[in-house]
Amino acid sequence: MDSGRDFLTLHGLQDDPDLQALLKGSQLLKVKSSSWRRERFYKLQEDCKTIWQESRKVMRSPESQLFSIEDIQEVRMGHRTEGLEKFARDIPEDRCFSIVFKDQRNTLDLIAPSPADAQHWVQGLRKIIHHSGSMDQRQKLQHWIHSCLRKADKNKDNKMNFKELKDFLKELNIQVDDGYARKIFRECDHSQTDSLEDEEIETFYKMLTQRAEIDRAFEEAAGSAETLSVERLVTFLQHQQREEEAGPALALSLIERYEPSETAKAQRQMTKDGFLMYLLSADGNAFSLAHRRVYQDMDQPLSHYLVSSSHNTYLLEDQLTGPSSTEAYIRALCKGCRCLELDCWDGPNQEPIIYHGYTFTSKILFCDVLRAIRDYAFKASPYPVILSLENHCSLEQQRVMARHLRAILGPILLDQPLDGVTTSLPSPEQLKGKILLKGKKLGGLLPAGGENGSEATDVSDEVEAAEMEDEAVRSQVQHKPKEDKLKLVPELSDMIIYCKSVHFGGFSSPGTSGQAFYEMASFSESRALRLLQESGNGFVRHNVSCLSRIYPAGWRTDSSNYSPVEMWNGGCQIVALNFQTPGPEMDVYLGCFQDNGGCGYVLKPAFLRDPNTTFNSRALTQGPWWRPERLRVRIISGQQLPKVNKNKNSIVDPKVIVEIHGVGRDTGSRQTAVITNNGFNPRWDMEFEFEVTVPDLALVRFMVEDYDSSSKNDFIGQSTIPWNSLKQGYRHVHLLSKNGDQHPSATLFVKISIQD
């Protein structure tokens, strides 16, 4: 039952000095502010999955002193967070490190007593994170069940009595009556000692993890045989899984990768265990493995792609009083975001700052944001990053901005047109590794010829920060003086190349735009919807050659989001959402952008790239987009659905909702029945059917909720998959948390078929 030792042995880490130091634990200084540094004891638990942290808070529960390593986004060495940058400059960098979490909880900033101690923690945690990520689904399940066994074994005798068995089932998110639990217990208690140990626990584990629905799928593929031959596996891959590459080569490759039995592997056969391993793997995922890499043509103009874009990137919470943070930029970039917003204002000491103007959100230095962007811009994707500058600065501080941009970003800043690219937008491939600026500009594509100190020129002020559409919002913000014109210095203007901000002047004639290809208009969501309703096809044609940026309405002071789908249907590329706000809109957004290798650029369908297209999502007619398809989805079962309420006695009552997002006529949803008191292995076996007319614009969202008869259902997990990335046959849907992070073992087992 020692899951930690199993983990260390599995990965050859049992004698690793870094992990031995973490298992022993050490005193570290926790840093919260310039006046708050406290010594606390931190220790890796024996399960190698959790860290125990000492707390001096009164009445704090033991569970609240633990955090899971699965919740860690990354471990940073040195002064690499705002906290350590501000509050630990007096401490050498080689003693400082930070634990950054996946969700939006505060970063844990720590100071070790020596550089060696800091190295143990940083390297040890990185090793566990790396090896946990490389575990297959079976290993993750085994590790998780063993850790639940450890928790249930209250007296630590490596045996399990009946009460401990009941506690164990609760840990696994299963509620069973005493009679059924007693029946399982007796079946496994071969020694009749009223406790389970060693092989008896192993027998119990096998009974628990047996999946009848996998057995049925295996029998469907293998017939009466005990194993799957290469020929049978090829037939299964062709007829059930609809694999385009189905053939002996693929079958042998799957046997080689997933078959645990060396004997079966030598005989070129797949056992039931190997079959399950395949179905739980990336090859058995409902999301196409081929789409996990960049596979689309990246040599087309930028306007031909949807671009993952963030609104008010600097905010961690709401738009009126929430904190601004460089960490928000890092999080967005790590999620593949390629267009960030910088709302720039005059700051003290001649240093420009970023915050949500005329509100009480906190302020961060422009230069600090640039350093964070420089360090993280190309970690998740090599393709270009666009910085959307909302410039409200004085002339002097604009010059400071220009100096910082050149000094900090250096050669990665695009500050002149690419050779020969002066008649259309360059491609993502041409702009790889480059940062572009979007903002107000004097003159056209080429620099206006100004030198430092030359005369500034009036341009119209940025409008978005001032857009307060709702009276309730206006009453909550500080007084904003009326200011229609902004003076712009040439040093900053000349850095704007392919993304010159302009006011939209309307469509000059059907199918054409009055804008130059390097000019870019921004639209509030309400104005964009109005344009889509009144001139849907005109908007689509405009977006063939020009970039359009959409941002949330001014009344969304809570940082809520709008649906991006309608904007994408109109060909709009830079559809900016509040990345800090989880919810269905962000689920769909991140689902769309996991396509094409998660690089932040998704090629629009051909009919949204054709300058002569007649497509209009609000008035559908026949055309190349009209490809009716029928989707059948059978929701078979769920696996290891996480507890919503951490209360030990709470067991989830899950139900599954399948949604289609796309053009209006294709949108719909269906839901399963509720399974009571079982989050470990609920079974539904319910089939749904959807008719979709424009599959190129459709996404399928699988959502699991915990049903509550007296209040709103609680969200458990979801996965959103673009239609063209959806795989057919028996598949596992791997569920994500509300923040878009992978649940380690939570899946839905489904059967999918798509027919013309």
Swiss-Prot record:
At which positions is Ca(2+) 3 bound?
A: 312, 341, 343, 390
What positions does the record give for glycosylation?
A: 191, 193
Q: Which domain of life is it from?
A: Eukaryota
Report residues binding Ca(2+) 2: 189, 191, 193, 195, 200
Q: What does the annotation give as the result of altering residue 549 to A? A: Lowers activity 600-fold
An example Gene Ontology molecular-function term: phosphatidylinositol-4,5-bisphosphate 5-phosphatase activity
Which part of the chain is the PI-PLC X-box domain?
296-440
Q: Which UniProt keywords apply?
A: Calcium, Glycoprotein, Hydrolase, Lipid degradation, Lipid metabolism, Metal-binding, Phosphoprotein, Repeat, Transducer
| Annotated Gene Ontology cellular component terms | cytoplasm; cytosol; mitochondrial membrane; plasma membrane
- Record CDD domains: C2_PLC_like, EFh_PI-PLCdelta1, PH_PLC_delta, PI-PLCc_delta
Q: Which residues form the PI-PLC Y-box domain?
A: 492-609
Phosphothreonine modifications at: 457
Highest lineage ranks of the organism? Eukaryota, Metazoa, Chordata, Craniata, Vertebrata
Q: Signal peptide span per the entry? A: none
Q: What cofactor does this one take? A: Ca(2+)
* Region: Substrate binding, residue numbers: 30-57
Q: Which organism is it from?
A: Rattus norvegicus (Rat)
Give the GO biological process terms.
Answer: angiogenesis; cellular response to calcium ion; G protein-coupled receptor signaling pathway; labyrinthine layer blood vessel development; lipid catabolic process; phosphatidylinositol metabolic process; phospholipase C-activating G protein-coupled receptor signaling pathway; phospholipase C/protein kinase C signal transduction
Subunit structure, per the record? Interacts with TGM2.
Q: Which reaction does this enzyme catalyse, per its entry?
A: a 1,2-diacyl-sn-glycero-3-phospho-(1D-myo-inositol-4,5-bisphosphate) + H2O = 1D-myo-inositol 1,4,5-trisphosphate + a 1,2-diacyl-sn-glycerol + H(+); a 1,2-diacyl-sn-glycero-3-phospho-(1D-myo-inositol) + H2O = 1D-myo-inositol 1-phosphate + a 1,2-diacyl-sn-glycerol + H(+)
* PH domain span: 21-130
State what protein this is by name.
1-phosphatidylinositol 4,5-bisphosphate phosphodiesterase delta-1
Sorted alphabetically, which Pfam families does this protein's record hold? C2, EF-hand_like, PH_12, PI-PLC-X, PI-PLC-Y
Enzyme Commission numbers on file: 3.1.4.11
